[in-house]
């Protein structure tokens, strides 16, 4: 018997079949909510002549965490399922399914998307966290503005690291034993990339394409387009932190010029 259909977020490889399964089974869909509104215009990518691989994305292809798994391929960047609306809305701590001896609760983890929801299973013996795309077993996660938010992503990673679950089950990649240690590495990796972006701005690199050419020099050119989205995500956080300024704009854009504060 299908009791509930748990949806982590509404990218096209996650939510589109949920309504069909709900109609076939009679079980409700459960999620944090529909896709968030785009908060601002991130502008057009200023690089127009470059090899492209539309099926691939590099959230940070140059320095992926080495343990416990090493990614073999770039992350697939999903399109958004803007038609998805859950039957039931769940937030952190809400019980979404339960029976004798086990319970599943929601854990809101914005960052990859604003509506990303993990699901925690506790059967009294093993604490399992279904992490969706928030923590993946084969690569780091795409954080692509405007719906993707690096500051929120880091905060959500810290929440997961502090839970001390026994195992994490991602939607991409193998199960992750000792997920807290794995997530600590993800946090360190992102903060190191943030430091590199800040150093690049302080060193006189003013545009995102310039930064990507330096920071991702060892990465295939067809991955530079998604890498620019990742650098933008870091710059959004640095601007909000007050360490970087956008020239002539209130919000960072792909085609903006940046300088140190």
Label every PLM stretch briefly:
Residues 2-3, 167, 197:
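Basic nucleic-acid-binding alpha-helical/helix-turn surface characteristic of O6-alkylguanine DNA
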Residues 26, 164-165, 205:
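Residue-level detector of structured alpha->beta connecting loops
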Residues 199-261:
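C-terminal regulatory/interaction regions
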Residues 1-99, 126-127:
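Active-site HxH/HxHxD metal-binding segment of metal-dependent hydrolases
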